[in-house]
Amino acid sequence: PAIPGDGSAKGSLKVVGYGTPSELADANPALKTFGVDLQIANDVDADIAHAHTWYACLAGYLAKMLHGTPLVITAHSLEPFRPWKREQLGGGYNLSSWAEKDAYEHADRVIAVSGGMREDILAAYPNLDPDKVVVVHNGITMSDFATPADDDPGWAVFDRYHIDRSKPTLLFVGRITRQKGLPYLLKALHLISKDIQVVLCAGAPDTPEIAEEVKTAFAKLDEERGNIIWIEEMLPRPELNALEHGCDAFICPSIYEPLGIVNLEAMACGLPV
């Protein structure tokens, strides 16, 4: 990530980081985002503005109105299909929904990451011209998920977290959020055989409340069945790759997933999902 206020270049690519204005340090998260968007829109000097999700939609839409910059949006999720975000944003959910709707309805092109996502976009925003909505699927670089060599340092993750490679193992990778379904998975795991080892790579909780909910559910599950490992840190790619190659199946309990990258990565490692 770029450091706020810092401009760096790699070849012809210039990356500029923005921070939340100090006046909004204690504001609702949606207002903090808008504060960043206003700075971006003010600085835009480009032929095309390309925004991803509502976090940058307002910046792109303002740039279009201010400077006549064509706006392209890539849709990875939609606010109307994520009502649980109100738990995180409070009234800010009304703001994020408003910003997304206005930006989508005035965009010059909207990219959906799957066919299902395109259908959702048109259902959520019927005023949007269908001819402006195209599908460009998410993808991954397959070579990044090749089977690690026996001496690959990534395998160290098994020893560090005491994961038994001789046991049948299920793997979950995702943020701690309603959308990713971890609270529901923890309830369901009471129903499977205690002989099955479960590894949860889960962090970055949406709210302190859901963090505590997951912590309590994990403790109860660990006491009742054991054989479960929780990795809260974000693993480096070599270790996550080794973990995916060393487990037997990948669990995706998401209740909303337009096209999950983690599922593609797991399949690239040969894991059933």
Model regions: which residues?
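Nucleotide-activated donor-binding/catalytic signature segment of Leloir-type glycosyltransferases, i.e.
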Residues: K167, L200-A202, A211-M234, P238
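Carbohydrate-associated surface elements
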Residues: G116, G139
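N-terminal strand-loop element at the rim of the active site
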Residues: P1-A30
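Aromatic "clamp/platform" in nucleotide-sugar-dependent glycosyltransferases that forms part
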Residues: I255
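Nucleotide-sugar donor phosphate/pyrophosphate-binding loop at the beta->alpha transition
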Residues: T69-V72, P80-D102, E119
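A conserved mid-protein helix/loop that constitutes part of the nucleotide-sugar donor-binding site
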Residues: P168-F172, T177-L191, E212
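A short helix/loop element that forms part of the nucleotide-sugar donor recognition site in Leloir-type
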Residues: A146-I163
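Short alpha-helical donor nucleotide-sugar binding micro-motif in glycosyltransferases
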Residues: N241-C247
